[in-house]
Regions:
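His/Asp/Glu-enriched, well-ordered alpha-helical/loop segment
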Residues: 271-353
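Active-site core of metal-dependent hydrolases
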Residues: 174-276, 281-296
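C-terminal cap of metal-dependent C-N hydrolases
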Residues: 20, 345-391
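Metal-associated gating/positioning segment near the N- to mid-region
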Residues: 59-120
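Metal-cofactor-binding active-site regions of metalloenzymes
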Residues: 94-100, 104-105, 120-147, 170-173, ...
Length: 392
């Protein structure tokens, strides 16, 4: 239920969310607490806050209140990248208030991405810059049809011009469709060179690369680098020939490489994730890899991916930490996003945990039957309601 008051009244809060259970992993909070917003930020969190001082009140009784979600792998450059989707209706409206575009734009296209997408969207958009200068423009020509497309100097120049938005360097390594045989593993090493020169990490899409195994990729990865699509079921995966997690995976995790889900249309396999988790391997971050080829399934949105990890046995706190506090640290915005601490930017989501049977399908057409589903019913961006299914 939502109540609004005369906008002319002098109120302490622009918005008050009351009676919900706050889950804020950054502060180890899982408790019934009210959250108040003013001037685009969180201003107070307490057991009870005065309803009379709020211009708008949302009653979240029986629901969970979380920081706005952070999705570290999406593709939101519509009209230029063949993967691109509109960020606001597909990400923000479904609870991902901050997203990281994972290489849709390269050095040649990033200025347009910034001007025509990032700066006009309500979704907060950051980026991994593709080492391929043209980015992910077409399905017909791979990013590395020629090795020259991996341009270190152009990548570094663009990073210097847009350091406020660019978090790292993205490289996709799938042979034939993305990387020609003549390019081989050159794009990986050029991405490493550019990232090192810029002092930033790399994000790697590893599947079916021009190498013997994932070992060859992981050996060039350092602390803070991101291996996305970590539970894919293709060649260059985390499972060895004996059906166990590769030793190189354990070693990489030990030295601080970030293993990210990046579900996508072809990069999440139930048998792989189940095998990995049975050996204690968990993703550091949960992301959707949401794009035009999976927004209508099997991904749908980030909340659906979270539901899959609830089915796998993670707790609500474990699931939400991987889309709030942990990615906030990786993008160096831990005091602004990924938390509802007073002073943080006013992004929040109200979730219902619906007890219902649901079919959860991976990227290979295999399904599991879940018994509960996370549904975002209200999204708050910059302290104001963006979407609200709880309106009176």
């Amino acid at each position: 239920m939502t109540f609004k008051k005369d906008v002319g009244l002098d109120m302490k809060y622009d918005l008050l969310i009351r009676n919900g259970t706050l889950i804020d992993p950054a502060r180890s909070i899982h408790a019934p607490l009210d959250v108040a917003f003013a001037d685009g930020k969180v201003v107070e969190v307490a057991e009870t806050l005065p309803v009379a001082q709020a211009r708008e009140v949302i009653d979240a009784d029986g629901r969970y209140v979380t920081p706005g979600l952070i999705d570290v792998h999406v593709h939101v450059f519509p009209g230029v990248s063949h993967f691109g989707i509109e960020p606001d209706p597909t990400c923000l409206a479904r609870g991902a208030t901050t997203v990281v575009d994972a290489g849709s734009a390269g050095a040649d296209t990033f200025p347009g991405f910034r001007k025509y997408v990032i700066e006009v969207s309500q979704t907060r958009i950051l980026a991994q810059l593709n080492i391929a200068s043209q980015g992910m423009v077409t399905r017909d020509i791979g990013e590395f049809a020629l090795p020259e497309y991996a341009d270190v100097d152009a990548c570094c120049r663009m990073i210097e011009q847009h350091r406020d938005l660019i978090l790292g360097v993205k490289v996709r390594l799938t042979k034939d469709s993305i990387v020609s045989e003549s390019s081989g593993m050159i794009p990986l090493h050029r991405a490493r060179e550019a990232a090192d020169a810029a002092g930033l990490p790399i994000m790697i899409h590893p599947q079916a690369a021009w190498c013997e195994s994932l070992d060859d990729i992981l050996k060039v990865m350092k602390q803070g680098d991101i291996l996305t699509h970590c539970f894919h079921g293709m060649a260059c995966g985390i499972i060895d020939e004996g059906g166990k997690v590769r030793q190189s995976v354990h070693d990489a995790i030990e030295r601080g490489v970030i293993f990210d889900v990046g579900h996508g249309a072809g990069s999440f396999a139930w048998d792989v994730v189940e095998t990995a988790m049975a050996e204690g391997i968990l993703p550091k971050t949960i992301s959707s890899d949401l794009h035009i080829y999976n927004v209508d399934g099997p991904v749908f949105d980030l909340a659906n991916v979270l539901t899959k990890f609830l089915h796998l046995g993670l707790s609500l706190d474990e699931v939400f930490s991987r889309v709030t506090s942990i990615p906030a640290e990786s993008v160096l915005l831990q005091d602004q996003i990924g938390t509802l601490a007073p002073g943080a930017w006013g992004d929040a989501v109200i979730f219902e945990l619906r007890e219902e049977t649901c079919t959860l399908t991976d990227s290979q057409g295999q399904s599991r039957t879940g018994t509960q589903r996370l549904e975002p019913v209200t999204v708050v961006k910059a302290g104001r309601t963006y979407r609200n299914e709880l309106a009176a």
